[in-house]
């Protein structure tokens, strides 16, 4: 990855609330399936905004911080009718590998992400922000606030 896109908590909240608006009316949804781990954060915001209390998870491992590896389904939420009436939420669709596995598990769910890269954008039903394919996203939950020394030292 040659570029980085740093997401602050404020940006994340704003983008996720925008995504939530697109999911109204809330009464059409039975619940949310959050893709662990990155989808847990936007799922919490969407659940709050839409008043949804039923939250399931699907746990898929494919990243080791900044390297994508083999896909491994660790846990899949058991919902009826291919996820009909559920919103599947992830933070990002990148290459589409995870998204394809999600689509197989929940073909009738509404699949949304906050961010999308070109290789996977067509695999989700909605997203808010386009990200170039060669860009690494630094999510706020992966960062900490630290002291940065001034440029001019005395």
From Swiss-Prot:
Q: Which UniProt keywords apply?
A: Cell inner membrane, Cell membrane, Glycosyltransferase, Magnesium, Membrane, Metal-binding, Purine salvage, Transferase
Q: Which residues bind xanthine?
A: 94, 137
What's its catalytic activity? GMP + diphosphate = guanine + 5-phospho-alpha-D-ribose 1-diphosphate; XMP + diphosphate = xanthine + 5-phospho-alpha-D-ribose 1-diphosphate; IMP + diphosphate = hypoxanthine + 5-phospho-alpha-D-ribose 1-diphosphate
Q: How does it sit in the membrane?
A: Peripheral membrane protein
Q: Give one Pfam hit by family name.
A: Pribosyltran
Which positions does UniProt annotate for GMP binding?
Answer: 94-98, 136-137
* SUPFAM superfamilies tied to this protein: PRTase-like
- Binding sites annotated in the UniProt record for Mg(2+): 91
Give the enzyme class: transferase
Q: Which cofactor does it need?
A: Mg(2+)
Q: What is its EC number?
A: 2.4.2.-, 2.4.2.22
Q: Name one GO cellular component term.
A: plasma membrane
Determine if Magnesium is one of this entry's keywords: yes
Q: Where in the cell is it found?
A: Cell inner membrane
Q: In which pathway does it act?
A: Purine metabolism; GMP biosynthesis via salvage pathway; GMP from guanine: step 1/1; Purine metabolism; XMP biosynthesis via salvage pathway; XMP from xanthine: step 1/1
Write out the residues that bind guanine: 94, 137
Q: Name one GO molecular function term.
A: guanine phosphoribosyltransferase activity
Function text? Purine salvage pathway enzyme that catalyzes the transfer of the ribosyl-5-phosphate group from 5-phospho-alpha-D-ribose 1-diphosphate (PRPP) to the N9 position of the 6-oxopurines guanine and xanthine to form the corresponding ribonucleotides GMP (guanosine 5'-monophosphate) and XMP (xanthosine 5'-monophosphate), with the release of PPi. To a lesser extent, also acts on hypoxanthine.
> What does the record note on quaternary structure?
Homotetramer.
Q: What is this protein called?
A: Xanthine-guanine phosphoribosyltransferase
